[in-house]
């Protein structure tokens, strides 16, 4: 191989390793067998959630994972691999890919990484069942509001009782 090609591949490894380090979550899938139309729809959905989706050679992915400190992730880079990176939302790539896989038998989740820790296929699928960030925040808000609401109702009940007594 020429030195120019080797340098280009080394640069690609560095770029992918940086994406892996910066990613909140990484999901690796086997997208072999998807039609062009399905792939286009999937990419559009991922882009809409600010998830980067790339098909990258396994040798590049293995070297990048090693460089990013995710050596155990190398075991999923077998056969055709596509990788979804999300820097913001941990749940988005897993949720979108899992929902898409329900309708497209050709798409198979292989594994990934969550906030720098390697995750198995089962862990990625479990992550996909969680509500998105907005859903989790609304749940938290309702839990925080419940005690205040209960106190307000108790005060109102006491006030109503005093009005009735007077």
UniProtKB/Swiss-Prot annotation:
Annotated SUPFAM superfamilies: Ribosomal protein L10-like
Disulfide-bonded cysteines: none
CDD domains: Ribosomal_L10
A GO cellular component annotation in the UniProt record: large ribosomal subunit
GO biological process, one term: translation
Ribonucleoprotein as UniProt keyword: yes
InterPro entries: Ribosomal_uL10 (IPR001790), Ribosomal_uL10-like_sf (IPR043141), Ribosomal_uL10_bac (IPR022973), Ribosomal_uL10_bac_type (IPR047865), Ribosomal_uL10_CS_bac (IPR002363)
MF terms (GO), sorted A to Z: large ribosomal subunit rRNA binding; structural constituent of ribosome
Keywords, in A-Z order: Ribonucleoprotein, Ribosomal protein, RNA-binding, rRNA-binding
Gene3D superfamilies: 3.30.70.1730
Similarity field: Belongs to the universal ribosomal protein uL10 family.
Protein function: Forms part of the ribosomal stalk, playing a central role in the interaction of the ribosome with GTP-bound translation factors.
Subunit architecture: Part of the ribosomal stalk of the 50S ribosomal subunit. The N-terminus interacts with L11 and the large rRNA to form the base of the stalk. The C-terminus forms an elongated spine to which L12 dimers bind in a sequential fashion forming a multimeric L10(L12)X complex.
Name listed for the protein in its UniProt record: Large ribosomal subunit protein uL10
Annotated organism of origin: Streptococcus gordonii (strain Challis / ATCC 35105 / BCRC 15272 / CH1 / DL1 / V288)
Gene symbol of the encoding locus: rplJ
């Amino acid at each position: 191989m020429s030195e120019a090609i080797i340098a280009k591949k080394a640069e690609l490894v560095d770029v992918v390793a940086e994406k892996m380090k910066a990613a909140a979550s990484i999901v690796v899938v086997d997208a072999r067998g998807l039609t062009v139309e399905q792939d286009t729809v999937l990419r559009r959905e991922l882009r809409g959630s600010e998830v980067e989706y790339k098909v990258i050679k396994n040798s590049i992915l293995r070297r990048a994972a090693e460089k990013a400190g995710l050596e155990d992730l190398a075991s999923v880079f077998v056969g055709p691999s596509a990788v979804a990176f999300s820097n913001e939302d941990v749940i988005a790539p897993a949720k979108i890919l899992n929902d898409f896989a329900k309708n497209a038998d050709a798409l198979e989740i292989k594994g990934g990484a969550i906030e720098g820790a390697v995750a198995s296929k089962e862990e990625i699928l479990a992550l996909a069942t969680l509500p998105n960030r907005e859903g989790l925040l609304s749940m938290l808000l309702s839990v925080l509001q419940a005690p205040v609401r209960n106190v307000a109702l108790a005060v109102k009940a006491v006030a109503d009782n005093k009005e009735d007594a007077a």
